């Protein structure tokens, strides 16, 4: 299946009322389901809604996704992202470092969701994410 076809399927899955548009509420619900602060929906609409009608059409959604760098470039840059989160340079990301990174990125995720996410992705159960665990999450999320 082509990447664009996958994106279209995701769009339709988020579009709960099947009206062909993503509303703030639909985007916020989707974000909440994956553990991201629903307020990020406002930022997504602001950056994606080209005709300023307060909702995102399939065309606007696909155009925004087409502007993203190719997947290979994205994966190659994840090490830089990991290192920017790993403030103490330990080679591991603590829950505190992750929380600080998310807050400075405008994502205020509740502590319970953050702990649950960390528990799910901390495969060796040492309380921190190493780069391999981080990359495994990225690869699973951005297949």
From Swiss-Prot:
Residue numbers binding Ca(2+) 4: 122, 124, 126, 128, 133
InterPro entries (UniProt xref): Ca-bind_SignalingProt, EF-hand-dom_pair, EF_Hand_1_Ca_BS, EF_hand_dom
Domain EF-hand: 2-37, 41-71, 73-108, 109-143
Residues that coordinate or bind Ca(2+) 2: 49, 51, 53, 55, 60
Superkingdom of the organism of origin: Eukaryota
Keywords: Calcium, Metal-binding, Repeat
Gene3D superfamilies assigned to the protein according to its UniProt record, in alphabetical order: EF-hand
Record protein name field: 16 kDa calcium-binding protein
Tissue spec. comment: Found in eggs.
Binding site for Ca(2+) 3: 86, 88, 90, 92, 97
Task of the protein: Calcium-binding protein.
SUPFAM superfamilies linked to this entry: EF-hand
Annotated residues for binding of Ca(2+) 1: 15, 17, 19, 26
Gene Ontology molecular function, alphabetical: calcium ion binding
SMART domains: EFh (SM00054)
Organism annotation: Schistosoma mansoni
PANTHER family: CALCYPHOSIN, CALCYPHOSINE LIKE
């Amino acid at each position: 299946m082509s990447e664009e076809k996958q994106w279209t399927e995701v769009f339709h899955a988020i579009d709960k009322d099947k009206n062909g548009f993503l509303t703030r509420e639909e985007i916020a619900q989707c974000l909440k389901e994956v553990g991201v602060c629903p307020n990020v929906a406002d930022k997504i609409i602001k950056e994606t809604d080209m005709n300023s009608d307060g909702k995102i059409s399939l065309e606007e959604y696909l155009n925004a996704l087409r502007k993203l760098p190719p997947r290979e470039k994205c994966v190659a840059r994840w090490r830089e992202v990991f290192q920017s989160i790993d403030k103490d340079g330990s080679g591991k990301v603590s829950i505190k470092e992750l929380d600080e990174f998310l807050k400075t990125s405008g994502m205020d995720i509740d502590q319970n969701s953050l702990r649950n996410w960390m528990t799910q992705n901390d495969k060796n159960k040492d309380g921190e994410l190493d780069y391999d665990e981080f990359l495994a999450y990225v690869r699973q999320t951005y297949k």
